[in-house]
């Protein structure tokens, strides 16, 4: 078995994904470069297991620290699930606060698309009042209004490496001990679109 994308926990299987800390740091740096300082993390986690949500929150915190922006735990908003409705609920709750964010770093595109809808319904301009960034570069991110700035994993490389690892496991099954579990990171890029002024 080879896991692709997000690893739920250390489970003894090969894994291929991106460097989530670095990717979130770069996405946060992009928001900071646009003058955003009250950046909320939708789907984030401050404490707990070392899953994707925690790794991406760590990258966000690194970028804030490097820019001299104080970390505010109230801007890290956990969600029940990574679906559109959860992103919409989180964005609505953030906009009901007295001290509103000026940007949302959503830990996947589904959350970001839900957030965009909630912001639209409240009359908030994106990218004017807030910037929004997602993760994964799903197809809908290109067609939303505004189109969504997102972290795009190198999906072709993920597939290539995963097939290679799987074939090594299959071919090695009859020839002796299995190689140790491998964790392989592939590249990513920030795709700047309309939700951050692109």
How does the language model describe each region?
Residues 1-3, 7-198:
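Bacterial carbohydrate/catabolite-sensing allosteric modules
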């Amino acid at each position: 078995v080879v896991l692709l994308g997000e690893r739920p926990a250390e489970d003894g299987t090969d894994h291929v994904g991106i460097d989530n800390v670095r990717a979130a740091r770069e996405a946060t740096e992009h928001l900071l470069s646009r003058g955003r300082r009250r950046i909320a993390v939708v789907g984030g986690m401050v404490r707990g297991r070392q899953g994707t949500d925690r790794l991406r929150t760590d990258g966000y915190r690194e970028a804030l620290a490097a820019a001299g922006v104080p970390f505010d735990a109230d801007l890290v908003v956990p969600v029940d699930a990574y679906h559109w409705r959860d992103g919409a609920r989180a964005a609505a709750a953030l906009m009901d606060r007295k001290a509103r964010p000026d940007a949302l770093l959503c830990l996947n595109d589904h959350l970001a698309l839900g957030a965009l809808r909630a912001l639209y319904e409240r009359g908030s301009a994106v990218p004017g009042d807030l910037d929004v960034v997602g993760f994964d570069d799903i197809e809908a991110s290109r067609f939303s209004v505004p189109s969504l700035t997102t972290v795009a994993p190198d999906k072709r490389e993920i597939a290539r490496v995963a097939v290679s690892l799987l074939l090594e496991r299959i071919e090695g099954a009859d020839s002796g001990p299995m190689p140790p579990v491998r964790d392989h990171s592939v590249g990513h890029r920030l795709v700047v679109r309309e939700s951050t002024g692109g």
